[in-house]
């Protein structure tokens, strides 16, 4: 995505009072290293450097990089990188957390990037409220792919009045806690295929009629519109058994 489109999709939170309310829900300490997705005008960056060991802010807008650097002139535990987060290479040999107030229109791309291309153990994001709810919906492919790697929680509402320009909808602060992957490396491709066929209701491409009924019974599923992630994993495990 180009810089112009990113800039036009940005909504900033600048009130220290509102930022402090959001920060109370984020677990940080003086030993944490943080990657911030989009420093904006540096308001969250300033709070992060006061709480953490080191902050690396990744900002695509050159002018906002300079604004952030000027705002943090009295601090030396940070760097601002003028880069596109979707092209950024996260380190693989250090512990870190991620925070970001991310653009609505590339939320899916960003969340895929940081879950599958980073090793962050905790990820805090401000996202559109409807998007946050979709991340908990097992009828959505993105939710099913993410739930195999992270535990997803909605921590708090972020009212649209906090932002300028003010968006049309409210936002949420979400947390993604990394866990041991529920899908083995050798099964990743098979899992991705199963997810896509399942959410598109192409059941005949993954089960025979008898296999389907037996798998539902084994998973304890009575309603296809209301299944848990554990039940979905049970279906996938049945699929693997039938396709050895």
Curated annotation (Swiss-Prot):
One Gene Ontology cellular component: cytosol
GO molecular function term, any single one: 23S rRNA (adenine(2085)-N(6))-dimethyltransferase activity
Keywords, alphabetical: Antibiotic resistance, Methyltransferase, Plasmid, RNA-binding, S-adenosyl-L-methionine, Transferase
EC code: 2.1.1.184
GO process terms (BP): response to antibiotic
Residues that, per the record, bind S-adenosyl-L-methionine: 11, 13, 38, 59, 84, 101
Pfam family, one: RrnaAD
Gene: ermC
Disulfide bonds: none
Name the UniProt record assigns to this protein: rRNA adenine N-6-methyltransferase
Gene3D superfamilies: Ribosomal RNA adenine dimethylase-like, domain 2, Vaccinia Virus protein VP39
SUPFAM superfamilies per UniProt: S-adenosyl-L-methionine-dependent methyltransferases
Family: Belongs to the class I-like SAM-binding methyltransferase superfamily. rRNA adenine N(6)-methyltransferase family.
Protein origin, superkingdom: Bacteria
Top class in the EC scheme: transferase
Protein function: This protein produces a dimethylation of the adenine residue at position 2085 in 23S rRNA, resulting in reduced affinity between ribosomes and macrolide-lincosamide-streptogramin B antibiotics.
Catalytic activity: adenosine(2085) in 23S rRNA + 2 S-adenosyl-L-methionine = N(6)-dimethyladenosine(2085) in 23S rRNA + 2 S-adenosyl-L-homocysteine + 2 H(+)
């Amino acid at each position: 995505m180009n810089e112009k489109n990113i800039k036009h999709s940005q909504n900033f939170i600048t009130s220290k009072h509102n930022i402090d309310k959001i920060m109370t829900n984020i677990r940080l300490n003086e030993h944490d290293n943080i990657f911030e997705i989009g420093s904006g005008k540096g308001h969250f960056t300033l709070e992060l450097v006061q709480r953490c060991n080191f902050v690396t802010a990744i900002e695509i807008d050159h002018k906002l990089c300079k604004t952030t650097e000027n705002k943090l002139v009295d601090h030396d535990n940070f760097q601002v990188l003028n880069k596109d987060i979707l092209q950024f290479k996260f380190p693989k040999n250090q512990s870190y957390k991620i925070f970001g107030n991310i653009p609505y229109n590339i939320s899916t791309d960003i969340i895929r990037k940081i879950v599958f291309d980073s090793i962050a153990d905790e990820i805090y994001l401000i996202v559109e409220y409807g998007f946050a709810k979709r991340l908990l919906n097992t009828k959505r492919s993105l939710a099913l792919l993410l739930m195999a790697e992270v535990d997803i929680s909605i921590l708090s509402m972020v009212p649209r009045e906090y932002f300028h320009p003010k968006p049309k909808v409210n936002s949420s602060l979400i947390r993604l806690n990394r866990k041991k992957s529920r899908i083995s490396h050798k099964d990743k491709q098979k899992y991705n295929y199963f997810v896509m066929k399942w959410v598109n209701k192409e059941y005949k491409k993954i089960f025979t009629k008898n296999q389907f009924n037996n798998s539902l019974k084994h998973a304890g599923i009575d309603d296809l519109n209301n299944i848990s992630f554990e039940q979905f994993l049970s279906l996938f495990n049945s699929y693997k058994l039938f396709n050895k």
